[in-house]
């Protein structure tokens, strides 16, 4: 059993976004809000937002593939606390949190950075948490592993800043392969919650 805790964020950029068009649209939005886009403090905002969106929505341009693997005999691999940021597709407000990811290799393991980039591929776009969790699990499982578990915990600003204005967090989970079995599912959940239960390699 292998256990990793991962907190580094890897930055990529959306290369196909029309920067000038985005700046124009943001300027028009500022006017519609009732503000002056030429005043100090706002004059460079369209450019800043266009630049930020290239990074925030880089998942659409991701060609990240889980093709690089290494021979390794391990029952399960657990990667904890993968930080992610995404944008709710309903209100275009952020939701963010951490993902716990586990998989059972079939004789080969993936590089840790590849799995982090897989999370970024599906989080850096207009999303809902439920679909993001499913997307990550499905792609990882499609690469020949015996089982996958993905648990995402997130704060949603669309719920905190508007509407019910509640600070509740949201947890979603997806299980594939052997981890769909009740006993295996319960076991991997306990390992994710309590890494001390891992056997020493």
Can you describe what each PLM-predicted range is?
Residues 3-6, 12:
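Intrinsic-disorder-associated, low-complexity terminal segments enriched in Asp/Asn/His/Tyr and depleted
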